[in-house]
Design a protein with these regions (language model features):
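N-terminal secretory signal peptides that target proteins for export/translocation
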Residues: 1-9
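Bacterial N-terminal signal peptides
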Residues: 12-23
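Sec/Tat signal peptide C-region and signal peptidase I cleavage site
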Residues: 24-28
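Acidic Gly/Asp/Thr-rich repetitive segments characteristic of extracellular carbohydrate-active
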Residues: 30-57, 61-65, 305
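Extracellular beta-strand-rich solenoid/capping regions of secreted or surface-exposed proteins
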Residues: 42, 61-74, 83-124, 142, ...
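All-beta strand scaffolds that present successive hydrophobic residues in beta-strands
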Residues: 73-76, 103-107, 124-128, 147-151, ...
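Extracellular beta-strand/beta-solenoid scaffold signature
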Residues: 86-97, 112-119, 134-142, 157-175, ...
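Consensus "Asn ladder" position of solenoid repeat domains
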Residues: 108, 130, 135, 153, ...
Length: 310
């Protein structure tokens, strides 16, 4: 086949793809749900198609489950909608249980579940501009190979972990794509366990967030997991600012980011160390001003220490 034929074929393929995408957008629908009028999100989810938006208002006292076959939809709470788990027997103990893919969840207060937002699957979601508050277990939980982008969201007053990433999953916390400079910082505070927990062969970018007053460490990375932890403010947590253990690893800088080191504000020391490393972990990069009651660092002999001054 000559070059002209290849170019013509490529052009036709691109045109066809563009037409298909335009058709998808043209067919996208907006479904309005007023929970105060007796409508439910679950009823709307029964008929949505890829590209649709479910526009929600009111207080929705229901358990919301997004099925695995649901893809590329938006749930928009318009910053004025609450999803509140009703308690008692329900399809799931979690307020919002997502098994779908490429789901956008934005503008909600999510409360009253075992977990506030739970991804399992593998599932994928963009969680943007929400308040996840007063859930008895974890605020946001991501497992079984799921991927989440968590942006502009407050996670607070969970009974346990604030944001939990486990089971070969991945999370972008505070940044949409590592190479894009813009930050979308989250606030993770006043949770009953670590602010952020990364474990069991999982990974994360954790950039530009405020992580404070959690009962245990600000960030915990362990059990063969890895995280890039950059430009966060980590204050007044009950444990360390960052704990690394059990063959976990933390990079405190990256070629793709220029946001500066992590910080602990003056007078807001963490209860443990700035960084604690044990049982075969590693830490690489500038410590910044991370500190705690036990000083900036607490490493055992099994850890690889490649930390540096800012």
């Amino acid at each position: 086949m000559n070059k002209t034929a290849i170019l013509v074929g490529t052009g036709k393929a691109a045109l066809l793809a563009g037409l298909c995408f335009s058709a998808l957008l043209a067919n996208a629908a907006t479904v309005s749900v007023d929970c105060d009028a007796g409508n439910t999100i679950m009823a709307a989810l029964g008929s949505v198609k890829p590209g649709d938006t479910v526009l929600v208002s009111g207080t929705c006292k229901e358990q919301v489950t997004i099925a695995p076959e649901v893809v590329r939809i938006t749930l928009d709470g318009q910053k004025k909608t609450t999803i509140q788990h009703p308690g008692g027997p329900a399809a799931s103990p979690h307020a919002l249980y997502n098994r779908g893919k490429e789901i956008i969840i934005k503008g909600f207060t999510v409360t009253g579940g075992l977990d506030g937002i739970h991804l399992s699957g593998p599932a994928s979601a963009l969680i943007d501009g929400n308040v996840v508050v007063k859930n008895t277990g974890r605020g946001i939980h991501i497992d079984k190979g799921s991927v989440a982008r968590i942006l502009n969201t407050t996670v607070e007053q969970s009974g346990g972990i604030g944001i939990d990433v486990t089971g070969a999953s991945y999370a972008y916390i505070g940044v949409f794509i590592p190479r894009v400079p813009a930050l979308a910082p989250n606030t993770i505070r006043n949770n009953g366990g670590p602010g952020i927990n990364i474990e069991r062969t999982s990974g994360a970018w954790i950039v530009g967030n405020t992580i404070s007053n959690n009962k245990e460490s600000g960030i915990a990375v362990h059990r063969n997991s890895q995280a890039d932890v950059i430009a966060n403010v980590i204050n007044a947590n009950g444990g360390d600012a960052i704990t690394v253990s059990h063959n976990g690893g933390v990079n405190l800088s990256s070629e793709t980011r220029r946001d500066g080191p992590n910080q602990t504000a003056a007078g807001q020391n963490n209860g443990g160390a700035g960084i604690k490393c044990m049982i075969g972990g590693y830490v690489d990069g500038p410590i910044g001003t991370l500190t705690g009651a036990k000083g900036a660092k607490d490493f055992d002999k099994s850890c690889v220490d490649r930390t540096a001054a800012p």
